[in-house]
């Protein structure tokens, strides 16, 4: 983890490292779901990010956060990683479901008029 935001996913992510290029098929979806397991973020090789949540709002919030985390990793490839111990402490705050929902609420307020 390079950022506080990344601790939301550091212990709760999966990788779909398959050569599958057709992710919209039922079989492809089943393989992705198997890779995802109970995680909230799945990085799909050659496709991008997939997030899930208890609500659509939470899933969107997690996606926005995951995209930001990816951006930080691209911009700071040699950044000093947060230790696992510190990441575990931060994850207690950052990884809860309300965090994803709150990110969505911020996004909605930022982009949409009342």
Question: How should these model regions be labeled?
Answer:
Residues 1-114:
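Glycine-rich flexible loops
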């Amino acid at each position: 983890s390079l950022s506080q935001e990344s601790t939301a996913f550091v212990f709760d992510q999966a990788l779909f490292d398959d050569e599958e290029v057709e992710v919209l098929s039922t079989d492809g979806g089943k393989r992705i779901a198997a890779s995802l397991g109970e995680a909230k973020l799945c990085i799909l090789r050659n496709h991008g990010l997939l997030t899930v949540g208890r609500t659509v709002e939470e899933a969107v919030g997690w996606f926005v956060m995951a995209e930001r985390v990816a951006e930080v990793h691209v911009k700071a490839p040699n950044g000093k990683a947060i230790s696992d111990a510190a990441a575990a402490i931060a994850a207690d705050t950052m990884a809860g479901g309300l965090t994803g929902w709150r990110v969505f609420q911020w996004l909605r307020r930022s982009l949409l008029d009342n």
